[in-house]
Structure formats: C-alpha cells, structure tokens
C-alpha cells in the first residue's frame, strides 16, 4: 500500500504556526506518510514585514521552506493547515492562496482529499474556533473530507479541549500542544490511509 501523501501548509508571522507545522510534519512522517512541508507566500508589503523585528526574523527563518503551489495541492491526499487567526478568520496570506485554487476545484482535484486545521490567536477567545471552522467550510466547498481531532485522545483535553483542531494563544506551543498536534497529524494520516485504501 502506498504511503498517504500529506501536505503540511502553514503561514506564520511570528513563529507559532511554523512550529506547529514542523511538529505536524514530523508526526505525520512517523505515522507513515510521505510529507511535504510548505509555507504560504508572504503578501504583506515589504515595509510592513521589515518594520517589525520579530516578523522580519520569522520571514528569514522560513525563507528556505518551499512555497506551497497548485502542484502540492494536486499531489497530496490530505492537507494539514496551520495559520494564525485574524479577526476570526485565517490570515489573509492563506486566504489569498486558497482563492487561487479555483481551477483545481473546478476540475474536481480537491475533492475527496482529507483536511485538518490548527490556528493561533493573540487571545484565548480571539476567534480560534471560528478560524478553524471557516477553513472547514472551504473544504466542504471542495468536496473534501474533514478530519477533526474530536475528543479522540487525552492530549486534546490536556491542550485546552478544542475538538475542531489544535489552537493556542500566540507563543503558547508547549509540550501539551505538541502532543495534541502529533495526535491530530497521526489521525489525519490514519483516516487518509483508510479512505485511500
């Protein structure tokens, strides 16, 4: 049986979602998947990025990670998304990439793929669940199959109890969070394997 192909796709301003994505990629590989770790293209003006030392440092840290492409979306059997929350939805950088996927969607090339999502926000009640649900709404339009973690492992409870997908306050990716992300990535691989046969 071929290994499930998982694209771990992230956008990160200050590093939280980068850390989540790297951990998810390692966990998916450990669960038997072939993995591509991809970052979303930065669309903010250069002066905005360079005007904040932490943002600039994070952009430099991620520079060697390939940008996600339509080829990656077509290649993958499943997607693990991680992006920060902005006003109750995903950061515009991720939304901008998703908005380019019309040709793949129209050709049915996003249908029957598995999807799971994680996020972070500045505050505990800063729209984290809404962000994850909005990504799942997009997946429904694609005809994709949502693989939420639910309450299928103690790690979900330990990390705050979000059944839609791991979420955290900015900078709060600790050992409990890593365990929850590893479980979510492993579950994505397992469900993708079952669906792909």
List each language-model region with its residue ranges.
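Short, glycine-/small-residue-rich phosphate/pyrophosphate-handling segment
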Residues: 111-157
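Short aromatic-enriched loop/helix-cap "lid" or pocket-rim segments at secondary-structure transitions
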Residues: 47-51, 129-130, 158-161
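Phosphate-binding/catalytic loops
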Residues: 120-124, 159-172
